[in-house]
Curated annotation (Swiss-Prot):
Compartment annotation: Mitochondrion
Protein name per its UniProtKB record: Probable adenylate kinase 1, chloroplastic
Family: Belongs to the adenylate kinase family.
EC number(s) given by UniProt: 2.7.4.3
NMP: region residues: 90-119
Residues engaged in binding ATP: G70, V71, G72, K73, G74, T75, R184, N193, F194
Transit peptide: 1-26
A Gene Ontology term for the protein's cellular component: chloroplast stroma
Taxonomy of the source species: Eukaryota, Viridiplantae, Streptophyta, Embryophyta, Tracheophyta
Catalytic activity: AMP + ATP = 2 ADP
Keywords from the named record: ATP-binding, Kinase, Mitochondrion, Nucleotide-binding, Transferase, Transit peptide
Binding annotation for AMP: T91, R96, K117, L118, V119, G147, F148, P149, R150, Q154, R228, R239
């Protein structure tokens, strides 16, 4: 459990700096490949190539999904998790599980979430380390992280304990994000997520039109739907503002490493999923899975 131990040490006082220094030492000893015009135009191309090779050889990719609250990180990360056979680790789920457990952090977390604030580095690292330890004990290999890192400090800590192959940054215009978040519902019985919003936004001011069909629940879930406590317009807009203020340094951190893939969602799952697979060069992987299903 060396990786988790290093993660815990890094989260202690002064640990972030040590982790960042270790990451810089690794980077300084690597010889940067000569960039082709295509690689210069698309900084994520080299990272995508390395990640695709890792998929082909070992099926244990180590990816990160970034994006505003409600953009769909969990949806696309979980789909890729099933496609590639690696665990999907969502820090939002870790927080909600802790809230439901009535554990020592539950009261503190409830106050933070209900106010629309971001959970602190210390708490997130504590929850993530527990999840990594559990996965290692179960023999898991690789991961897709969803919702972590949110700060450069977290990115430095993560860089100090493991290699990230690629970072996918999902993007969606804010007016659509707000409407999407306000339509979210959870079945209080089965725990599945749904969305009642039917989004049909016209293109204007250079922005493309976006259509997202509602993700409706089956009849047996309809009467059991609940709204998350943090899905009010005031809280949603506050969370988006906080995220936007904090996300740019993290995006810059991974952009500088040539690992950041910016992906603008063109619509709902039917429109976005095939295009995401195309960008990741995973269409063949999807076809093979469907053929053997």
């Amino acid at each position: 459990m060396a990786a988790v131990q290093r993660l815990l040490r890094a989260s202690a006082s002064g640990g972030a700096a040590a982790a960042a220094a270790a990451a810089r030492r690794r980077m300084s000893t690597a010889v940067a490949p000569e960039q082709t015009p295509a690689a210069a135009a698309f900084p994520f191309a080299a990272a995508a190539g390395r990640a695709r090779q890792r998929v082909a050889e070992e099926r244990n990719v180590q990816w990160v999904f970034l994006g505003c609250p409600g953009v769909g990180k969990g949806t696309y990360a979980s789909r890729l998790s099933r496609l590639l056979g690696v665990p999907h680790i969502a820090t939002g789920d870790l927080v909600r599980d802790e809230l439901a457990s009535s554990g020592p952090l539950s009261v503190q977390l409830a106050e933070i979430v209900n106010q629309g604030k971001l959970v602190s580095d210390e708490i997130i690292i504590n929850l993530l380390s527990k999840r990594l330890k559990k996965g290692e004990e179960q023999g898991e290999s690789g991961f897709i992280l969803d919702g972590f890192p949110r700060t450069v400090k977290q990115a430095e800590i993560l860089d100090g304990v493991t290699d990230i192959d690629m970072v996918v940054n999902l993007k969606l215009r804010e007016d659509v994000l707000v409407e999407k978040c306000l339509g979210r519902r959870i079945c209080g019985q089965c725990g599945k997520n749904f969305n009642l919003a039917c989004i049909d936004v016209k293109g204007e001011n250079g922005l493309p039109p976006i259509y997202m069909a509602p993700l409706l629940p089956p009849n047996n879930c309809m009467s059991k739907l609940i709204t998350r406590a943090d899905d009010t317009e005031e809280v949603v807009r506050n969370r988006l503002q906080i995220y936007n203020d904090m996300s740019q340094p993290v995006e810059g951190f991974y952009r500088q490493q040539g690992k950041l893939l910016e992906f603008d969602l063109p619509g709902g799952i039917p429109e976005s999923w095939p295009k995401l697979l195309h960008v990741l060069n995973l269409e063949d992987q999807e076809e093979m899975k469907l053929a053997t299903a």
